[in-house]
Amino acid sequence: PHELKQSRADIPEIARTLGEILGKDPIWIEEQAADIKRRYKQVGTRIDEETAGKIRDYINEKGISGIHLEPTSQRVYPYETLAAQVVGFTNASNEGCEGVEAAYNSFLAGSTGRVITTKGNNEMDMPFSYENYVSSRQGDSVILTLDATVQACLEKQLSAAIARYDVQNGAFGLVMNCKTGEILAMATLGSYDPNKYLEIADTDTAAQLEEMKRVYLAQPEGSEAYEAGKTAYGEALSAARLKQWRNRVISDGYEPGSTFKVLTMSAALDCGAIDLNTPFHCSGSEQIPGRAQRLHCWRSTGHGAEKTPQALQNSCNIAFAHIALKLGGERFYEYVKNFGVLEKTGIDLAGESKGVFFDKALVTDTDKWGTASLTSGSFGQTFKITPLQLVRAIASVVNGGQLLEPYIVSEILDADGNTVMKAEPTVVRRTVSKETSDTMRTLIESVVTEGTAKNAKVAGFSIGGKTGTSEKIDVFDENGQRVQDKIVSFVGIAPMDDPEYIILAALDTPSRETGIYISGGVMAAPTVGAVMADVLPYLGVKQSFSEDDIAGKQIAMEDLTGMTAKDAQSLLKKEGLTAAISGSGETVTGQIPSPGQTVPGGSQVLLFFGQTPEPETVKVPDFYGMNRQQASDAAGALGLYILVTGNDEISTGVTVTAQNAPKDTEVPAGTTITLVFADTAA
């Protein structure tokens, strides 16, 4: 400011020009320029090179003295939106905000070098003064447990589910190592770009904000309408930013729904309240002792006679209400406490909450309060926990009974590469016995093979899991009526013989307009299945195919040209393939599929003798809604193969819900199209 005044610069004109270039209020810039008591005033930070160039041109054109550009450093996020809520960002002052940036700011920041010297009353250096130099310290490097490939796969499948089911309020999910507590992926969608953290990433929200801004700017400045509109715009902008920065996996509680049944059944088996042969009967609804209203199962016609395994496979609310009564309020509450539901997980991220559970008396004093809280709580309703709390608890059920402290930072290195901190798995406490854990692994796997989660199947992998569908009981419409919005979820575990990875996917408010039945089994289970199909091979989990699921095995075609018919057929047979022969001759002269293409196990390969097939491309049909037979016929007519993923039952109700190649994509004949099958009926 002092330099500008001495140069007799046209400060109002400078303020207008800089305001236009920087997108800032010219009046505010003029106020900064008028503060001549300060040596300098900062009016812009983190400006890009294009903007800096415009300012340089303006300075040179006008010959202005008193405007300076200083090079600075800033954090660059090359992965952009990937894991944005986990990583966080640094603000204009290079301070860590949100996520890892906030939690580990003291390690990442380092310290700035400085010179301590004497100044005159105009903040200018004095002659013959002393100077003391303090060296800078580089910040440490923080190494995350996140795997970029796994994170990208999780976000890709959540995004696909949002589009497929017209999900209204985003999605969240995570991938954790069951044995260590390491977080391999953690996602909240919609996301944002930490490089542009102040920009609203959601286009609809951004458009609404722009309209609010346009409306208030159209009012006379200083008028009541102008000021009210400006305030409302500022509040809405702030709320939108906070929403997109929020990590729902650790910060937001939600009703877990039927995924919580894993914990209830584990507790009841562990203390002997039930065994595998305990009988139940579900008629669709029942007047449970201690409840004012009849309890309804999700299946209105009921499940009939069941034993413990079927109660979990069918996700039967009536059976679980009786399990809760057998367990009793005291034991139920103590197991819930042991599972970590009443406490934060301790993850090394800023902003973790612990959800909201019942007051102990509501569960234990059933003489006074009835059994509504106890029985509803047994199947995950009328309380809230965070997604991470749930995943940590279920991981303990399948890993032998050890409740782990999840972590996101594996190691911290100083500027010289020396280890400052190295994370190790931390066991908090035991939740259930190893014997109970072994039993539960078998039961959880049966939910995928025989129960409500068949849509999560991935050929060649042993997968277990539990579906969940919960109502958002605290959401109301403009008339104060409770809406029927739902969160659908699925927790999947693999491989079940020795669990390593646990994956949660949750979709917040799928639209009814799609006509697809809204449930965790229909929507979230195939989403997790798709994540597993992507990441399990990458993580080194080996596939093992039985004769029943050989069609799910992908076989890379070898080059059979030059082989005799006998040798080619013998090689194909070893791979679980058959051959059809076209033409005559001693050796193979061509083949469909071509060498290097993949085909499902059990497929037929076309071998040419004495002729070479002309290269041919075909358009991929729209398989959506077809059952297995229809899809097979449509593919076969075009010389295509199909790889079945998801629900492998052959039924008219099990249909294609997704395909890896869009309709009308041109592909070579012999290409394998991956189809996701799911039972979308209620």
What are these regions (language model features)?
Residues 1, 154, 176-184:
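Short, glycine-anchored, charge-dense loop/turn motifs used at functional sites
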Residues 1-8, 15-18, 37-46, 87-91, ...:
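Second-shell loop/turn segments in exported
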Residues 4-9, 13-21, 27-139, 481-482, ...:
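Small/polar-residue-rich segments within soluble enzyme cores
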Residues 9-16, 20, 27, 45, ...:
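Solvent-exposed, polar/charged alpha-helical surfaces in well-ordered, non-transmembrane soluble domains
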Residues 40, 127-171:
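Conserved, well-ordered alpha-helix/loop/beta-strand core segments that scaffold catalytic motifs
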Residues 423, 460, 464, 474, ...:
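Ligand-recognition elements built from short beta-strands and adjacent flexible loops
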